[in-house]
């Protein structure tokens, strides 16, 4: 995840996440980045990853009460959210129509990038997605006009999912009786699609009127503070580790 990873000699039966607080780009820029660096061979399940956070943004996150939400968001990237969705050396290919600016067929905000994992799809339909008319389901971020290119392909589409924790921006509504950035069953389902054992009971209450697609300018007019999380998906080298300790690069 950009964090410094020490030499390891121990056995890992779950996942190890290294954490680092460092200057990145000053206040109000990239708040952090995260991703896996080692995965279990033949799976899309992380073994070791890292998270780093910009020391110049910590006070802002703390003042907004967002630190826990941001850490959870970045942990999900370590587990493969937006990273293990597709790749020639991965067992799954769930990302359709990637929003890659280097692709001549990509049109900003128009290419209908979406996630096709069956569990996430079923959960999306279950919470109102059967009314979604904006394109294919489950919609993935395809527009970098409001946020940076780093938001593409690695988050749920902000204009559709709004405050959901794995959308492109973190929200603050100031109401202590509501959850600012809920963890939806769609996100949990996406991890089941990656092969993880999940608990849907851990989801927060979250329903959307998916037939309504929010215009970015209207979202900005809500005067609800948001923290831009684009650029937080670390897409560096990833290696797979076999049960015998054999290591090979897969990305």
Residue ranges and their predicted role:
Residues 1-72, 78-251:
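Extracellular zinc-dependent metalloprotease catalytic-domain scaffold
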């Amino acid at each position: 995840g950009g964090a410094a990873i020490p030499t390891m000699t121990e056995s890992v039966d779950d996942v190890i996440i290294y954490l680092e607080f460092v200057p990145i780009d000053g206040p109000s820029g990239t708040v952090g980045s995260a991703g896996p660096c080692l995965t279990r061979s033949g799976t899309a399940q992380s073994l070791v990853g890292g998270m780093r956070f910009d020391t110049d943004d910590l006070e802002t996150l703390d003042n907004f009460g967002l630190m826990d939400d941001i850490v959870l968001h970045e942990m999900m990237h370590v587990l493969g959210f937006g990273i293990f969705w597709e790749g020639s050396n991965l067992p799954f290919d769930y990302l359709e129509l990637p929003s890659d600016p280097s692709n001549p067929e990509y049109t900003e905000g128009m290419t209908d990038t979406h996630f096709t994992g069956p569990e996430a799809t079923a959960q999306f339909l279950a919470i109102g997605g059967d009314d979604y008319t904006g394109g294919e389901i489950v919609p993935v971020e395809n527009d970098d006009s409001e946020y940076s290119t780093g938001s593409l392909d690695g988050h749920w589409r902000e204009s559709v999912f709004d405050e959901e924790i794995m959308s492109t921006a973190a929200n603050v509504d100031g109401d202590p009786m509501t959850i600012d950035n809920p963890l939806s069953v769609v996100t949990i389902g996406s991890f089941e699609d990656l092969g993880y054992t999940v608990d849907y009971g851990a989801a927060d209450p979250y329903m959307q009127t998916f037939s309504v697609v929010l215009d970015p300018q209207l979202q900005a007019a809500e005067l609800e503070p948001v923290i831009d999380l684009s650029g937080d998906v670390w897409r560096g080298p990833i290696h797979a580790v076999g049960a015998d300790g054999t290591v090979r690069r897969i990305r």
